[in-house]
């Protein structure tokens, strides 16, 4: 998929070229949703979690060109780490979250060091193998993970000892929103830095970057580890919000969903994860009420249309519409 010019249309969000109002708008909407959502806060929390998960994939795939099918391995690792820590060590959500992020980052560092020496189909198959092995291990290790029944009995203490994680979802939503904002700022600073620009060079031409002395492997390992930590954070948020870890967090289907979300929203856009996750989950929620399988058909059509007509995902919709309207005006003037 070709990369649209980030300086045009909504793509400017990704490179910090929008006004302060433009940057603040998505966050203002998220805050307003907290007050207006009513009984949909739990749904909103899931949207925030998937945004963070998609953002983690965007760092690896979009900005560094690391094509992976195994992002669910880090999401699931973080989810199980947070759940097991809450059961066996401490139910404090912040401490559990930090531990989950740390161990997932370490897992990403180790696996990245092993597989980033490879490229192309070999690398893709290795990421596939990692998530498949983890899924099977979690399925078989019933005493540790609960197997197919999932990890149950995860009790989460009140946040700061004051705010309970209730069924209404207020605490979980605000907690997820703050965590997402912190990670977004980190991601934005990374992609806007000289390090981020070097990743863009590596994505386009790794041989040339090596020729000018760039430590390509080390930089890929660094962004791969950061991507893993971010995905692990999303997994930990999922555990804290639902107090349950299902085996599906390690499934290939989960890796596929996050890839679809990113493609729908727009790769290398940062805010593309926001658009993609919101649209995907809204369509899923709406169409699933009509038929349990109908939503997959709708999402499939959206994905095909996005790939064919919107090179930059739904984030590119405004630019495409302006282009079409411009052509219509020119045709009318003739």
Language model features by range: what are they?
Residues 1-334:
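Transmembrane alpha-helices and adjacent helix-loop boundaries
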């Amino acid at each position: 998929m070709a990369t649209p010019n980030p300086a045009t249309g909504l793509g400017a969000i990704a490179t910090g070229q929008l006004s302060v109002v433009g940057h603040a708008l998505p966050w203002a909407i998220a805050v307003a949703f907290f007050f207006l959502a009513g009984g949909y806060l739990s749904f909103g929390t899931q949207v925030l979690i998937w945004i963070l998960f998609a953002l983690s994939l965007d760092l690896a795939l979009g900005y560094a060109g690391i094509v992976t099918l195994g992002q669910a391995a880090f999401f699931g690792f973080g989810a199980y780490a947070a759940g097991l820590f809450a059961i066996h060590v401490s139910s404090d959500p912040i401490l559990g979250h930090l531990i989950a992020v740390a161990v997932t980052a370490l897992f990403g560092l180790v696996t990245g060091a092993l597989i980033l020496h490879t490229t192309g189909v070999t690398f893709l198959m290795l990421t596939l193998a990692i998530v498949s092995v983890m899924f099977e291990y979690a399925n078989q290790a019933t005493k540790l993970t609960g197997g197919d029944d999932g990890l149950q009995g995860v009790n989460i203490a009140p946040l700061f000892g004051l705010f309970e994680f209730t069924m209404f979802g207020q605490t979980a939503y605000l907690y997820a929103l703050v965590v997402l904002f912190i990670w977004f700022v980190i991601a934005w600073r990374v992609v806007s830095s000289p390090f981020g620009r070097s990743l863009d060079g590596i994505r386009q031409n790794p041989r040339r970057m090596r020729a000018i002395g760039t430590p390509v492997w080390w930089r890929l390992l660094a962004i791969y580890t950061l991507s893993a930590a971010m995905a692990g954070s999303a997994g930990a948020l999922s555990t804290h919000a639902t107090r349950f870890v299902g085996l599906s967090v390690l499934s290939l289907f989960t890796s596929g969903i996050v890839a679809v979300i990113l493609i729908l929203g727009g790769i290398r856009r940062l805010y593309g994860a926001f658009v993609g996750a919101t649209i995907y989950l809204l369509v899923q929620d709406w169409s699933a009420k009509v038929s349990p399988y109908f939503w997959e058909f709708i999402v499939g059509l959206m994905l095909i249309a996005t790939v064919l007509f919107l090179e930059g995902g739904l984030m590119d919709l405004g630019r495409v519409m302006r282009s079409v309207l411009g052509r219509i005006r020119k045709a009318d003037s003739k």
